């Protein structure tokens, strides 16, 4: 077989995600850089996106390595783990698929929940208001949470230590930093209205408040 079943599931999920998210991403891209408050800061605007794309490339290599179609230098254990009980490895891979499903729901649902306030850059758009509908009822930055979850899930599905490390220790901090920057803009603009919203969610930026721990 060309791919293990979990890898085919990742491909299918990614394909569906591209199709479903294209309309909202196109609108968000068209609004980029048009905000009433916008800071052209590489660490805020571009670094999270570029590192996420780099991680996707690493996941791609790891997936092909996991399925024995590539053999890059240091393939094991850097790009994928291939030693151990095959059934256990596949079970872990399926766990990654489940995490990826959750991530895609949060990511795409977060973009749609923002509606006309969604831009692919961190900025405050003209006429923007504090929103608490859709997935914004559960977490302050559902799309960023979803991006991180999706990359973690795809990394686990590929049994990729390098991709998982990038997701947790590089991608996640960059998106969290961007989330905090956006909060500063929203607090400056909306004051107590936004603070009240954040307090209602226990200031949970990435992990819904119904989980006992989180950020």
Language-model-derived ranges and their functions:
Residues 1-132, 151-215:
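Membrane-anchoring alpha-helices and their flanking helix-loop junctions
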Residues 94-95, 132-148:
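Membrane-interface loop-to-helix entry segments
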């Amino acid at each position: 077989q060309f791919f293990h079943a979990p890898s085919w599931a990742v491909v299918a999920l990614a394909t569906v995600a591209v199709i479903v998210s294209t309309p909202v991403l196109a609108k968000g891209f068209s609004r980029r850089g048009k905000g009433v408050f916008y800071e052209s800061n590489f660490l805020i605007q571009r670094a999270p996106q570029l590192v996420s794309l780099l991680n996707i490339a690493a996941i791609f290599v790891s997936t092909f390595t996991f399925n024995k179609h590539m053999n890059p230098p240091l393939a094991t254990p850097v790009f994928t783990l291939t030693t151990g009980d095959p059934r256990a490895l596949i079970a872990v891979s399926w766990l990654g698929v489940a995490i990826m499903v959750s991530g895609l729901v949060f990511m795409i649902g977060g973009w749609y929940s923002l509606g006309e306030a969604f831009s692919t850059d961190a900025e405050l758009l003209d006429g923007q208001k504090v929103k608490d509908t859709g997935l914004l009822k559960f977490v302050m930055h559902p799309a960023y949470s979803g991006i991180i979850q999706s990359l973690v899930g795809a990394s686990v599905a590929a049994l990729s230590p390098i991709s998982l490390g990038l997701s947790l220790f590089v991608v996640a901090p960059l998106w969290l930093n961007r989330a905090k920057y956006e909060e500063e803009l929203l607090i400056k603009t909306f004051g107590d209205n936004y603070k009240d919203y954040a307090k209602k969610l226990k200031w949970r930026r990435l992990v819904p408040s119904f989980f006992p721990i989180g950020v």
